[in-house]
Amino acid sequence: MVASMASALARNFLGSTPRWYKMTIVMFLIINPFIVALNPFVAGWLLVAEFIFTLSMALKCYPLLPGGLLALEAVFSGLTSAEQVKHELSANLEVLLLLMFMVAGIYFVRQLLLYVFTKLLISVRSKIALSLAFSVMAAFLSAFLDALTVVAVVISISVGFYSVYHKYVSTHPEHDINNDDSIHKQHHADLEQFRAFLRSLLMHAAVGTALGGVCTLVGEPQNLIIGEMAGWNFSEFFIRMSAVSIPVLICGLATCVLMEKLKWFGYGTVIPESVYLILKQSADHDDAHRTTQERLKLVCQAIICVWLIVGLAFHLAAVGLIGLSVIILATTFTGVSDEHAIGRAFTESLPFTALLSVFFVVVAVIIDQELFRPLIQMVLSAPQEMQLTLFYIANGVLSMVSDNVFVGTVYINEAHTALVNNVISRDHFDLLAVAINTGTNLPSVATPNGQAAFLFLLTSTLAPLVRMSYGRMMWMALPYTIVLAGVGLLSTMYLLPDMTQWFYESGWLQHKAAIPVITPASH
């Protein structure tokens, strides 16, 4: 009886996850308390490594389960406190609202998005031109919208493309998008090629959000924190960042073209002709049979999308609240009144919202155990002429494994403190702020946990459909990581000081004599 109970418990634990993975998580849970007792600092870094491991195994088991167990143990073992976790969640409330409401809001305008991107996919036959179009559109949108919103759009339209083809070649009347058993064998090769095609477009678009997001005050949450701390407005932020962001943007887009031409790192796969014909046939059929009511729905969704862009660009409300308004308007004017139909919009976002909340527990451990303090102290103790380079590198390394908002906030607070204590000049502080922002945004494309948008893509329902794993995402991001991080570093070292001086001399920027009056944000 006892043996059968133990066997049943073992089977229930983490469900259908492989046995070796279950044993690994159990081993983590057993070892961690002993490491905490010996050295909490080492235990903190071990927790970070273990959490990254759960993310890398996202296709084996959704990271919320094993990551959540590790996070609970971290709180109970004293690595952090429930109060600190609550503080982190409060500090990131806008991000949580964004995930809950904006992603769901995008769900209700997906017909328009699918219509627009289907037209783009059908009309642009060159894979290089199509990849560049996806990257440029993602970069432009993410300069004004949050990267998560942009990635949610790309995920929505990719699922639309995939489901159209998958349903067409399925032999079962009850179509299951997650099951390939119903697909004829002769279609398997085309399906795999189509998956590779979608993966490349997804990665171009995801990296595009980083290219555009670094440029503007509203591009990323940490940009807003850094800009407010420095007392910069929208135009000044763009000008100061341009010494680094523009060369990076140009080189990033060139990398997009080069990868497609050379077909390296999983890029260069073209859409199979059979898939293209099916998508075109589906689009032509939809156009021919679209009713007046359906056309009006598209018009309403277009108007709502205009409101979305205007509301976000002018910061009329928190991003999540604008997303809530999109849900209200879209459901009202497209006739979605059933509770269950509305509920389906939240199935994509809420698991990730819970996972991100678990991630903030890890961030709380990083703060309470001061895991980054040795690196921060090393950077601040370096000679001023080396600080730009070191700030960029230190931010880049840490933002690969931690929350970008947290990393950016920690470093800008330290730089602000140095300014207040007259350790550095105001002009040097402004240069450091640029290095902090670019260092936080650019190298973080290296890993999915470095960019929230990448993590969202990895843990979305689309990832298993197109076989996007943690390792594959890192591999496909590698050329972009090298180019973005490398060009960003060289621009920070050699272009930023001289270009900033030229901006002063040309009257584009004014020297700021006063210390910013913004109180450093606690995070």
Swiss-Prot record:
Its membrane topology: Multi-pass membrane protein
Ion transport in keyword set: yes
Location relative to the cell: Cell inner membrane
Catalytic activity entry: 2 Na(+)(in) + 3 H(+)(out) = 2 Na(+)(out) + 3 H(+)(in)
Key words of the record: Antiport, Cell inner membrane, Cell membrane, Ion transport, Membrane, Sodium, Sodium transport, Transmembrane, Transmembrane helix, Transport
GO cellular component: plasma membrane
Pfam families, per database record: NhaB
GO molecular function per UniProt: sodium:proton antiporter activity
Signal peptide positions (record): none
Segments passing through the bilayer: 28-48, 51-71, 89-109, 137-157, 237-257, 302-322, 347-367, 390-410, 445-465, 476-496
NCBIfam families found in the cross-reference section: NhaB, PRK09547.1
PANTHER family with a match to the protein in the record: NA(+)_H(+) ANTIPORTER NHAB (PTHR43302:SF1), TRANSPORTER ARSB-RELATED (PTHR43302)
Protein family: Belongs to the NhaB Na(+)/H(+) (TC 2.A.34) antiporter family.
Function as written in the Swiss-Prot or TrEMBL entry: Na(+)/H(+) antiporter that extrudes sodium in exchange for external protons.
Protein name: Na(+)/H(+) antiporter NhaB
Native species: Tolumonas auensis (strain DSM 9187 / NBRC 110442 / TA 4)
Gene giving rise to this polypeptide: nhaB
